[in-house]
Design a protein with these regions (language model features):
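Mature extracytoplasmic/periplasmic domains
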Residues: 356-419
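Periplasmic solute-binding protein
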Residues: 180-188, 210-240, 268-269, 353-359
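Early extracytoplasmic/lumenal segment of secretory-pathway proteins
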Residues: 116-182, 442
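Extracellular/periplasmic bilobal clamshell ligand-binding domains
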Residues: 402-442
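Ligand-binding pocket segment of bilobal, Venus flytrap-like solute-binding proteins
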Residues: 259, 263-266, 270-344
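A structural signal for short loop-to-beta-strand junctions that line the ligand-binding cleft
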Residues: 167-172, 190-227, 243, 254
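Short beta-strand->loop
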Residues: 123-126, 212-217, 229-231, 237, ...
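Sec/Tat signal peptide C-region and signal peptidase I cleavage site
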Residues: 111-115
Length: 442
């Protein structure tokens, strides 16, 4: 069965039509003997504005509560009638009364089932098809249904601000440390205490605790920011640190995506934390001078450009390279054979690791279920999905992975990753954006 979603017109009155809800499931219809609920929109929501995608999650929950209430009111009324009629004093009940009470019991059960349905409403920036297995696994393990809305990081944060207290979101999944930090600073997440999460996720891969010890967000998977190079033109020793991307010896050799992309902003925020603002700005200026072409495309485009000879060195997230390494397409195999890979700064602070992470929404209506979902994502089953399905490293401590591409990148050996708090990277982003403007990094 399907549930209908109500739209409100500019006057606040309920219109004469309904539209199908986008979230299918076992629902009672607004049909038959059920009168339409008369609700006004929340005071802080403009009824003239069009409903946001997924707004039906909240409407659906309101309707379930109303239907359960409708059933319970009928039960009370029936019981009152029975008492008034003094039927309880009868030595035997007629078939009619028995049928009536049976109907009461069935109605109560149906209402309770609707009222107690377990759900968690997810806003996710993870657009990876392999994550479907995560959601299925969670529902199978807990019985909690996931209602999901997909958007990019910036879109999700903007939507949470617009929805305010009316937001149906319970869990937020974002794919960049800087955006997680921004959501925390904007008050869009609620700090939580979870021994499961705090034991599993290292302190440097989560937000700093608030006064009562609560954590606003947790990293759930990691990805390295790597340097790739053309093996026929460049020696690995010439690009084994991030600093060498700005060295004059590499003038005219560098390809990179836009400096304002979140993956680069986080890298630049990390370098700023290590070098200080003055040296970091000089480094950014040096990279601009070393560009082989204006920044464009995504990380995969940079890898292909190195293989094609358009540039000699480039910067990419590890999972983009891993995808190509696991591909059987001849063109991908040819690219991989031409490029080498560097995990930068192994002799100093270590390779920058960005995160994908999660938080409980500030106005979560299903807070307990939200915490359960984050705890599930930090468990061994989900962490292995991240590694094998999307070529990410687990954020949780003490897990071994069996991803052939990730092993090949590191030649089966551990590598040194930076240990600065990832929240410090997010705190540097405003400075980084100002520096990019000053040095003309597009």
């Amino acid at each position: 069965m399907r549930v209908s979603k109500h739209y409100w017109n500019s006057s606040g009155a309920k219109p004469a039509f309904t539209a199908p809800e986008q979230f299918a499931g076992s629902r009672l219809p607004l049909a038959g003997g059920f009168p339409q609920p008369r609700r006004r929109p929340p005071e802080d929501v403009n009824p003239a504005s069009a409903p946001l995608p997924g707004e039906g999650i909240a409407r659906q929950a309101q309707h379930m509560h109303w239907v359960a209430t409708w059933f319970l009111l009928r039960i009370i009324r029936v019981c009152f009638i029975i008492k008034v009629s003094n039927l309880q004093k009868m030595h035997s009940m007629s078939k009619t009364v028995k049928a009536l009470l049976t109907a009461c019991a069935l109605a109560a059960a149906a209402g309770a089932a609707i009222a107690q349905e377990q759900v968690v409403n997810l806003y996710s920036a993870r657009h990876y098809s392999t994550d479907e297995a995560l959601y299925t696994g969670f529902t199978k393990a807990t019985g909690i249904k996931i209602n999901r809305v997909d958007a990019d990081d910036a879109g999700i944060l903007a939507r949470l601000k617009a929805e305010g207290t009316a937001s149906p979101a319970d869990v937020i999944l974002l794919v960049d440390a800087a955006r997680l930090y921004r959501g925390e600073m904007d008050g869009l997440f609620q700090p939580i205490r979870s021994k499961v999460l705090e034991d599993a996720i290292p302190a440097n891969l989560r937000s700093l605790p608030v006064a009562d010890g609560g954590i606003s967000w947790f990293g759930l998977s990691t990805r390295a920011r790597l340097i790739v190079f053309n093996k026929a033109k460049v020696q690995k020793s010439d690009v084994d640190t991030y600093e060498e991307l700005a060295d004059p010896k590499n003038k005219g050799k560098l390809c990179i995506r836009s400096g304002s992309h979140p993956y680069n902003l986080s890298l630049f925020g990390s370098v700023t934390e290590h070098l200080g603002e003055q040296k970091a700005e000089a480094w950014l200026k040096g990279m601009v001078a070393n560009l082989a072409r204006a920044p464009k495309g995504g990380d995969t485009d940079q890898i292909k450009a190195v293989a094609a000879g358009e540039c000699d060195i480039a910067v990419t997230n590890s999972y983009y390279l891993a995808r190509m390494m696991r591909s059987s397409k001849p063109e991908d195999v040819a690219v991989v054979n031409k490029v080498g890979v560097v995990f930068p700064n192994q002799q100093s602070w270590g390779t920058h690791m960005n995160i994908a992470g999660g938080a409980v929404a500030r106005h979560a209506k299903n807070q307990a279920n939200a915490v359960k979902f984050l705890e599930y994502l930090a468990g061994a089953e989900a962490q292995n999905y991240f590694a094998n399905g999307n070529n990410e490293w687990p954020a949780a401590k003490g897990l071994n992975i069996d991803n052939p591409a990730l092993k090949a990148m590191t030649q089966g050996q551990p590598f040194k990753s930076e240990t600065i708090p990832i929240s410090a990277v997010g705190a540097n982003i405003t400075k980084v954006q100002q520096m990019l403007d000053r040095v003309g990094f597009q």
